[in-house]
């Protein structure tokens, strides 16, 4: 299934089920491309997980690693717990990332995505350590001939672009999530994707409405029902020359399967 020339995929974690359940949902929707969460491959039962994945006739557009300490309850909680920023969990998270990189290579996938954490240039000591950690992970990815994709989220597009320009690393790109720009209240996603265009390798298809109370989360809604301006966003992707995958992500709502199916139908109907 495609939207124009872009493959349509789904984020495996959106379906909140095991590999067999993901496969069944994808078959019912009519898609064969997946953005695959791989933390389950790194613990007990990891080999069974990988075997189940390898038994599927999937195109894996990217893998994803998340970290156990991440707390998305509030904007403040994710600011201090997200990604590779917290010192207490750095060694554990570094090990998880390296394991995920090995899995990515084993599966023959080019991209490994993650939320890097909070980029805070105002705190020099934190910023230096954060920078060094990202460089070390990108170096490890590059040595394995894969690319680390940083997901948009807690910073404006300009802040992320400045960070990427400072890194100037060939093994770093961006997984652009337009809804996150709205959920975190960090700017207009259409303007943001233009700013980050040179780095954008992979897209999350997700929609949201901005909060009316500063300092609180926006509200995620089904694709096409929110403030991303889905048609204009897709048009912009064409204008910047994006040639990757559109991976549907749904992290809220009572009918995730139905919402993912709706998003796939809306995407595939775009001429």
Q: What is each model feature region?
A:
Residues 18-21, 72-173:
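Active-site acidic/histidine proton-transfer and metal-coordination neighborhood
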Residues 35-54, 116-122:
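Glycine-rich, proline-tolerant flexible connector loops at the mouths of alpha/beta enzymes
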Residues 44, 73, 122, 213, ...:
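Glycine/Thr-rich phosphate-binding loops of Rossmann-like dinucleotide-binding domains
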Residues 46, 83-90, 123-127, 186-189, ...:
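Flexible, glycine- and charge-enriched loops at secondary-structure boundaries
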Residues 68-80, 211-217:
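Short, flexible, mixed-charge acidic loops at enzyme active sites
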Residues 1-8, 15-32, 54-57, 135, ...:
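Histidine-acidic metal/acid-base catalytic patches
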Residues 58-62:
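Short, structured active-site "lid" loops
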Residues 11-15, 37-41, 65-68, 117-119, ...:
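Active-site beta-loop-alpha junctions enriched in small/polar residues
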């Amino acid at each position: 299934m495609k939207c124009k020339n872009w493959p349509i995929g789904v984020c495996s974690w959106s379906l909140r089920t095991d590999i067999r359940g993901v496969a069944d949902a994808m078959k019912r929707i009519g898609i064969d491309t997946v953005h695959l969460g791989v933390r389950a491959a790194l613990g007990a039962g990891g080999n069974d997980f990988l075997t189940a994945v390898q038994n599927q006739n999937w195109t894996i557009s990217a893998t994803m690693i998340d970290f156990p300490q991440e707390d998305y309850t509030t904007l403040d909680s994710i600011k201090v717990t997200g990604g590779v920023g917290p010192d207490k969990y750095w060694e554990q998270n570094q090990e998880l990332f390296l394991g995920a990189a090995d899995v990515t290579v084993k599966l023959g996938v080019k991209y490994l995505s993650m939320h890097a954490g909070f980029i805070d240039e105002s705190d020099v000591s934190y910023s230096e350590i954060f920078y060094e950690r990202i460089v070390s992970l990108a170096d490890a990815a590059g040595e394995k001939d894969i690319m680390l994709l940083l997901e948009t989220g807690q910073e404006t597009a300009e802040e992320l672009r400045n960070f990427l320009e400072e890194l100037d690393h060939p093994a770093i790109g961006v997984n652009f999530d337009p809804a996150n720009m709205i959920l975190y209240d960090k700017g207009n996603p259409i303007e943001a994707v233009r700013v980050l265009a040179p780095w954008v390798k992979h897209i999350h298809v997700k929609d949201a409405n901005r909060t009316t109370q500063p300092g609180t989360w926006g509200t995620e809604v089904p694709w096409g029902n929110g403030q991303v301006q889905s048609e204009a966003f897709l048009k912009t992707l064409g204008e910047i020359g994006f040639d990757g995958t559109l991976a549907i992500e749904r992290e809220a709502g009572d009918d995730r399967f139905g919402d993912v199916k709706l998003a796939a139908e809306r995407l595939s109907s775009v001429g």
